[in-house]
Structure formats: structure tokens, C-alpha cells
């Protein structure tokens, strides 16, 4: 035995123990910090609550978005993006072409350039790093000269769900609390079926279907050459009907327009749809929120079904159960532009769309 072993001092062990305790304390503080930071960055659209502390993160410059034209050359009211969805980023959005050299993004609405695209596109040379967005809410038959746009655009923005920026005509969102609307007042539904149509083409699929349907069922048609529908009275008029013919003028994937989201759902009428497939509609709506013409072998069978629902209140009301948890929302130009703003905030890579025509048609 080493005679000096009994006399070996103990303080090095105390120092090691103190060091271990200190490291443990540092680790606890570090992981607590990580947990709080992760909670603050969940991606929730809500702004951080009760945030009185100063943020030391450098402020990111506000991005500048230029509208090449107002949609259909009609100015629209713009809102701050952070007011539309609290907690989200803002951009400066303008139609003033003088800011073109400084713009981070240019939104080009196809309808307003399609008569002569190359002469109506933004001028060359394009500022370095500037992104161009092809924006369109019309179906392929209404979009001419797409082939002239090859390799000009960086992002797509449309009603198609496979767009870089998805801008549907409407959507459903959960109620934040209890539904704010009263139950459906059936006594106010004094009429059966309505259809408001402005673009009447006798050889179109929807007009042909209507003509077969109305041989078995009374349908009140509003619009040119039909019943007048004074401006400002549309919702009041359509709200009297139990069913609304949400017949699209073109049958293409995801092309589900205001005919359903506004004319039918905002009027609390059950939509009878003619458009893409039932499975396509069910990507955006509960299966019991609408009636699809494809569910019936003939317009006569559909007419019989609507007449049955008219007499069976319980079955008719079953088409409104989804409203207990969901509510319909309709698009706005301002919100669509804000979606482009948020995409620009998130998307760092620079890409080029080789062919708009090959993708969209």
C-alpha cells in the first residue's frame, strides 16, 4: 500500500462535482430555451401574444410587388396582409409601373395581356433576381396565346391546386368557436331551383343539361334574356331557393368557381354541380355538401331526387350538417396578392416555368 494514499486531498473531486453540476444547469437552461423558441416558431398565423420584449432580430426589408395591370383593368382595394391574416408578413403592393426596376416580383394577369402577350409583358432587361408570376383564374379555353409565354415566368398562380400559388375561388374553414349563424329557416325557402347565367351558349354542356332537366322540373333562370336580377338583390333572391344549379361554363380540374362558393353557398342553397368529377369536388367540400349531376343516370332522375328532397325536410337538412363545423369563404383579389407576398417570403430558389401551355392545357 502506498503510505501517501491516505493523505491524498479530496478537493479535486469536489471541483469535478461542482463542474458537473454547473454543466447540468447550463444544459437545463439551454434545452428550456430551445423549447420556448420552438413554441414561438410553430408557424401559427396568430401574432405572438403579449410580446412586449424587443426583438433583436434584424428587420427584413419589406418586399415590393408590382401588379403589371389591375385585374381586368379595374382597380381593387388592397389591404395590409398582416391585417388579413394576423401575424403574417407584409409586402408593399402597387400598380405603379415606375417602381418596376426596384420590384422584387411582378404579377401578370393573363386576361389583360393575352391579346398580344409579348408586347404587354414587362420590359426588358428584367432586373436581376426579379420574379414574374403568371396569374390566371380562367379555364384553358379562355386563355389564348399561352405558347408565347415560354420561359418568361418563374411561378404560377391560379385556381389549379398544383399551382405554385394556389388561389381558389373559395374554400371551407373551421369555425373558431360556436357557429355564428342561426339554423336554416326552412320557411324562407319558398322556391325550388334557381340558376343565374350570364354567358348563355346553346351548344354548351350546361345549357344542354338544363334544357333536359327543365322538361321534368321547373327551374327559374336569371340573367340576359331571362328573369331580371337587379344589382344588389342577387343574394336576397337566390336565398329563397332550396337548390342552385352551380353549372360551370368549362369542365376542367379544380375549376370550381363563384357559382358554387358565392351563388349557392352564400345563399344557403344546396348546390347542384356540373363541372369536374365528384372526387375533384370532394377535395374541397364534404361529400354531403352538394349534389353532383353525375350521381344520376339522367336529368329526369335528378329532377325526381330534388322533388323528393323538397318533401323530406330531414333529408334536405342533412345537406347543411357540415355547417356546424365549417364555413364557406370566397376569394378576394387582395388576399390572392398577399398569398404571392407570403410565397415570396418563403421561396428562396429561382426557377423558370418552361411552358405555361404544356402545364395548363
Curated annotation (Swiss-Prot):
Annotated Pfam families: Glyco_tran_10_N (PF17039), Glyco_transf_10 (PF00852)
Subcellular location: Golgi apparatus, Golgi stack membrane
InterPro entries: Glyco_tran_10_C, Glyco_tran_10_N, Glyco_trans_10, GT10-like_C_sf
Keywords, sorted A to Z: Blood group antigen, Glycoprotein, Glycosyltransferase, Golgi apparatus, Lipid metabolism, Membrane, Signal-anchor, Transferase, Transmembrane, Transmembrane helix
PTM per Swiss-Prot/TrEMBL: Glycosylated.
Pathway assignment: Protein modification; protein glycosylation
Gene Ontology CC annotations of this record: extracellular exosome; Golgi cisterna membrane; Golgi membrane; membrane
Membrane topology, as annotated: Single-pass type II membrane protein
Effect of residue 20 to R: In Le(-) individuals
Topology Lumenal: residue spans: 35-361
MF term (GO), any: alpha-(1->3)-fucosyltransferase activity
Annotated segments matching region Disordered: 39-58
Protein name: 3-galactosyl-N-acetylglucosaminide 4-alpha-L-fucosyltransferase FUT3
Annotated organism of origin: Homo sapiens (Human)
Amino acid at each position: 500500500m502506498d503510505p501517501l494514499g491516505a493523505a491524498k486531498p479530496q478537493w479535486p473531486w469536489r471541483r469535478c462535482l461542482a463542474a458537473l453540476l454547473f454543466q447540468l444547469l447550463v444544459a437545463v437552461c439551454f434545452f428550456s430555451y430551445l423549447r420556448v423558441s420552438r413554441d414561438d416558431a410553430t408557424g401559427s398565423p396568430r401574432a405572438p401574444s403579449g410580446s412586449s420584449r424587443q426583438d433583436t432580430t434584424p428587420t427584413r426589408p419589406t418586399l415590393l410587388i408590382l401588379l403589371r395591370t389591375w385585374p381586368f383593368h379595374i382597380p381593387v382595394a388592397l389591404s395590409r396582409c398582416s391585417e388579413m391574416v394576423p401575424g403574417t408578413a407584409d409586402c408593399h403592393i402597387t400598380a405603379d409601373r415606375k417602381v418596376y426596376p426596384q420590384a422584387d416580383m411582378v404579377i401578370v394577369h393573363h386576361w389583360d395581356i393575352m391579346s398580344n402577350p409579348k408586347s404587354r409583358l414587362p420590359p426588358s432587361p428584367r432586373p436581376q433576381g426579379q420574379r414574374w408570376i403568371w396569374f390566371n383564374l380562367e379555364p384553358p379555353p379562355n386563355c389564348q396565346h399561352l405558347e408565347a409565354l415560354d420561359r418568361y415566368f418563374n411561378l404560377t398562380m391560379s385556381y389549379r391546386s398544383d399551382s405554385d400559388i394556389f388561389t381558389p375561388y373559395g374554400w371551407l374553414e373551421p369555425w373558431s368557436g360556436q357557429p355564428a349563424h342561426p339554423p336554416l329557416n326552412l320557411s324562407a325557402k319558398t322556391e325550388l331551383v334557381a340558376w343565374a347565367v350570364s354567358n348563355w351558349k346553346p351548344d354548351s354542356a350546361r345549357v344542354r343539361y338544363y334544357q333536359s332537366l327543365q322538361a321534368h322540373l321547373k327551374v327559374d333562370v336569371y340573367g340576359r334574356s331571362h328573369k331580371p336580377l337587379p344589382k344588389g338583390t342577387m343574394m336576397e333572391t337566390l336565398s329563397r331557393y332550396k337548390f342552385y344549379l352551380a353549372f360551370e361554363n368549362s369542365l376542367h380540374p379544380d375549376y370550381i368557381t363563384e357559382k358554387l362558393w358565392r351563388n349557392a353557398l352564400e345563399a344557403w342553397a344546396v348546390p347542384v354541380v356540373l363541372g369536374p368529377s365528384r372526387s375533384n369536388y370532394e377535395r374541397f367540400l364534404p361529400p354531403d355538401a352538394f349534389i353532383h349531376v353525375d350521381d344520376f343516370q339522367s336529368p329526369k332522375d335528378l329532377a325526381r331526387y330534388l322533388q323528393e328532397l323538397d318533401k323530406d325536410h330531414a333529408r334536405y337538412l342533412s345537406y347543411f350538417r357540415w355547417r356546424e363545423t365549417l364555413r364557406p369563404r370566397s376569394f378576394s383579389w387582395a388576399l390572392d396578392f398577399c398569398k404571392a407576398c407570403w410565397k415570396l417570403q418563403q421561396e428562396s430558389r429561382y426557377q423558370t416555368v418552361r411552358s405555361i401551355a404544356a402545364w395548363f392545357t
